[in-house]
Amino acid sequence: MFDFDATLPLMALQFVVLAFLLNAIFYKPMNKVLDERADYIRTNEEDARERLAKAKAITQEYEQQITDARRQSQAVIADAQAEARRLAAEKIAEAQRESQRQKETAAQEIEAQRQSALSSLEQEVAALSNQILHKLLGPELIK
């Protein structure tokens, strides 16, 4: 069935030569390309990790700055509100003092006018009383 003549060793030799040729022409360049690609992927992955770490650090730093800025702005707002309340209280107190002063001035003027009116009424009452006495009693009896 099988002949063991020179074809079998020749085929074996062809197989070995073909294996060496395929290895030299196809497998080594392909392995080189695959290794270069793996190195390229590994390098890019490391760069991406570094960039991601830097981005996270920068993001964290910016978030901290935003938090600090918010705190500062809230403090500024609180200070401004306190200052506004203080100024409003001062203005209200000043207005109340001015109102009280005007009220006292008006009360003094009213009292002065009242006293003046009472004084003039007393004089008029005295004059009218004298006139009534003159009319009732006559000018001779009054002296």
UniProtKB/Swiss-Prot annotation:
Superkingdom assignment: Bacteria
Listed A to Z, the keywords are: ATP synthesis, CF(0), Hydrogen ion transport, Ion transport, Membrane, Thylakoid, Transmembrane, Transmembrane helix, Transport
- Please report the record's description of how this protein sits within the membrane: Single-pass membrane protein
Q: Which Pfam families does the record associate with it?
A: ATP-synt_B
Q: Does the keyword Cell membrane apply?
A: no
Per UniProt, subcellular location reads as:
Cellular thylakoid membrane
Q: Write one Gene Ontology MF term.
A: proton-transporting ATP synthase activity, rotational mechanism
Question: What are the GO cellular component annotations?
Answer: plasma membrane; plasma membrane-derived thylakoid membrane; proton-transporting ATP synthase complex
According to the record's subunit comment, the protein's assembly and interactions are: F-type ATPases have 2 components, F(1) - the catalytic core - and F(0) - the membrane proton channel. F(1) has five subunits: alpha(3), beta(3), gamma(1), delta(1), epsilon(1). F(0) has four main subunits: a(1), b(1), b'(1) and c(10-14). The alpha and beta chains form an alternating ring which encloses part of the gamma chain. F(1) is attached to F(0) by a central stalk formed by the gamma and epsilon chains, while a peripheral stalk is formed by the delta, b and b' chains.
What family is this protein classified in?
Belongs to the ATPase B chain family.
Q: So what does this one do?
A: F(1)F(0) ATP synthase produces ATP from ADP in the presence of a proton or sodium gradient. F-type ATPases consist of two structural domains, F(1) containing the extramembraneous catalytic core and F(0) containing the membrane proton channel, linked together by a central stalk and a peripheral stalk. During catalysis, ATP synthesis in the catalytic domain of F(1) is coupled via a rotary mechanism of the central stalk subunits to proton translocation. Component of the F(0) channel, it forms part of the peripheral stalk, linking F(1) to F(0). The b'-subunit is a diverged and duplicated form of b found in plants and photosynthetic bacteria.
* Name of protein: ATP synthase subunit b'
Lineage here is: Bacteria, Bacillati, Cyanobacteriota, Cyanophyceae, Synechococcales
Gene this protein is translated from: atpF2
